């Protein structure tokens, strides 16, 4: 059922349209589902905020972490905080009431910040892949990655993210409640007159999903080839072989993490866009959005907590300057400095 500034994902046989800005949406799903959504958002907040905030704090406290290659990881933490503060809090609050209580303006604000955080995160992963490919594979001879390049990479993620999130605020597409009507996102659902949703969705999927997906697969594919070549040239070196296995494992985890985060949401959104008028329930879009929102937790785990240097500094900060696991860390760490492959491993 389509309203002037919303879309209810169900067939309305009664002819009554209940605005998600004014009325509880308990007729869509069992009220227990709204309670679960609120509890899930609360879980993401109490885990996602401390982990990402701690990442920023630890970096400010430890000078050795403030290196150009780590700038993009900090940007990733900032983007996750945008999602937590700008998106999860409002979704939790709305789910407690059963509808989007913040009104049309609140929907624009929540949709903008939640989408901005997601886009910055997505492009940060693409820039991270480019940086590692450039540093390890050296496609440009005599190129030395420095602070200016890192700042440029971070700036690009913000510019690209804004190029996706600002247009719906100024009339090219729009933000509307989606799923269980407690969170707002891009309008994939309608072809509302005057918003040019079709062209925007095609632009978004082409430039802001397909392009970063290609970048990640290309860069990490080339990186794996470089690591395997380095390992093949030093077959007698157990250290190099171990480094290859570590890098391969991390690349696989990174790609899987990206796909788990974005592929379900993007696939369902594209299906809804290309099958407008088809019947689907509110959970059809709500469940994939859970995967995308969960990135605020597993992004820090994959890209930061599994980074030896970040992990050791984080433990030192938490234990007031001491690392009780220092012996274990040193014993389990591999001396991969001798291999060029080691510079890519975030672990």
UniProtKB/Swiss-Prot annotation:
Glycans are attached at residues 12, 197. It comes from the Eukaryota. A lipid is attached at residue 320 (S-palmitoyl cysteine). It is a multi-pass membrane protein. Residues 1-33, 94-107, 171-199, 272-283 are extracellular. Phosphorylated on some or all of the serine and threonine residues present in the C-terminal region. Contains one covalently linked retinal chromophore. The chain crosses the membrane at residues 34-58, 71-93, 108-130, 150-170, 200-221, 250-271, 284-305. GO terms for cellular component: membrane; photoreceptor disc membrane; plasma membrane. One of its GO terms (biological process) is G protein-coupled opsin signaling pathway. Belongs to the G-protein coupled receptor 1 family. Opsin subfamily. This is Rhodopsin. The lineage of its organism: Eukaryota, Metazoa, Chordata, Craniata, Vertebrata.
